Amino acid sequence: MGIEGVLKEGVVTTSADKLINWARTGSLWPMTFGLACCAVEMMHAGASRYDLDRFGIIFRPSPRQSDVMIVAGTLVNKMAPALRKVYDQMAEPRWVISMGSCANGGGYYHYSYSVVRGCDRIVPVDVYVPGCPPTAEALLYGIIQLQNKIKRTNTIAR
């Protein structure tokens, strides 16, 4: 967990970076941006079988209350400005998970004139979750990968 040592008196020593990153990884608040069938799997991951609450993940309805955006589904050109606007409303630090083949690169509709070929053209993406649609386990693995990425960042040195 980033704890460097425990002394005999019950005192824990750590660095500020590790403490901040530990708190951030244990309290990710994602905002759902469900656009298609991948959103059903995202809701499935939030249900009791997978219990994302045990990881400190609580879905928030507002971008101002969340620090993770999960883009799930086909992003069309008409929806791209709304995605960027919602992303800009999120407080720093913020992360994005791209869920499913359509969000990753256009998916089945890649050659359509109205489809954005990957949400990374609109917002910076931290973790890609493959699949059509990806399972709830795949999303859970992607969230764990995001937690590992957050643990490796230097928060004070930014």
Curated annotation (Swiss-Prot):
Top-rank EC class of the record's enzyme: translocase
The UniProt keywords, alphabetically, are:
4Fe-4S, Cell inner membrane, Cell membrane, Iron, Iron-sulfur, Membrane, Metal-binding, NAD, Quinone, Translocase, Transport, Ubiquinone
Q: Where does [4Fe-4S] cluster bind?
A: 37-38, 102, 132
Please provide the Gene Ontology terms (biological process) for this protein.
Answer: aerobic respiration; electron transport coupled proton transport
Task: Cite the InterPro entries for this sequence.
Answer: NADH_UbQ_OxRdtase-like_20kDa (IPR006137), NADH_UQ_OxRdtase_20Kd_su (IPR006138)
Q: Name one GO molecular function term.
A: quinone binding
Instruction: Tell me where it mainly resides.
Output: membrane
**In terms of domain of life, where is this protein from?**
Bacteria
As for subcellular location, the record says: Cell inner membrane
Reactions listed under catalytic activity:
a quinone + NADH + 5 H(+)(in) = a quinol + NAD(+) + 4 H(+)(out)
Q: How is the cofactor bound?
A: Binds 1 [4Fe-4S] cluster.
Q: How is this protein annotated for GO cellular component?
A: plasma membrane; respiratory chain complex I
How is this protein positioned relative to the membrane? Peripheral membrane protein
Which cofactors must be present for this protein to function? [4Fe-4S] cluster
Protein EC: 7.1.1.-
Q: What's the family?
A: Belongs to the complex I 20 kDa subunit family.
Q: How does it assemble?
A: NDH-1 is composed of 14 different subunits. Subunits NuoB, C, D, E, F, and G constitute the peripheral sector of the complex.
NCBIfam families per the UniProt record, alphabetical: nuoB_fam (TIGR01957), PRK06411.1 (NF005012)
* Function field: NDH-1 shuttles electrons from NADH, via FMN and iron-sulfur (Fe-S) centers, to quinones in the respiratory chain. Couples the redox reaction to proton translocation (for every two electrons transferred, four hydrogen ions are translocated across the cytoplasmic membrane), and thus conserves the redox energy in a proton gradient.
Q: What is this protein called?
A: NADH-quinone oxidoreductase subunit B
Q: Which organism is it from?
A: Hydrogenovibrio crunogenus (strain DSM 25203 / XCL-2)
